[in-house]
Amino acid sequence: VDVPPLCNFILPAIVRTGPLAVAISTAGASPALAKRMKREIAELFGEPYANLAVILNEVRGWAKATLPTYQDRRQFFESIVGGDPDPIELLRTGRVAAVRELIEDAMRAYAPVA
């Protein structure tokens, strides 16, 4: 029974796309608003973001094995995510190979010199 005064928990609206999940809550104030926000967030952060998450996950092992510190790994991934060209825009236009090239360039730039 949905009787807010008798409830002691609230379920968020959740947007799931690939490995991404975004939870939205209005603390029970407005399920209709949460539904609208869920729809808008799904449109804004859809497939390109999920695809980038999958691609970045593919290089996590390399980063952990190659880059010695958390700071090094953070800089590496931030250089890709905030890179120029923007990987999200590349994915929105179907240019997956260009994103992979961007990542390969970052791997070469951040790999320790042997």
Question: Could you describe each region identified by the protein language model?
Answer:
Residues G28-A114:
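An accessory alpha-helical subdomain
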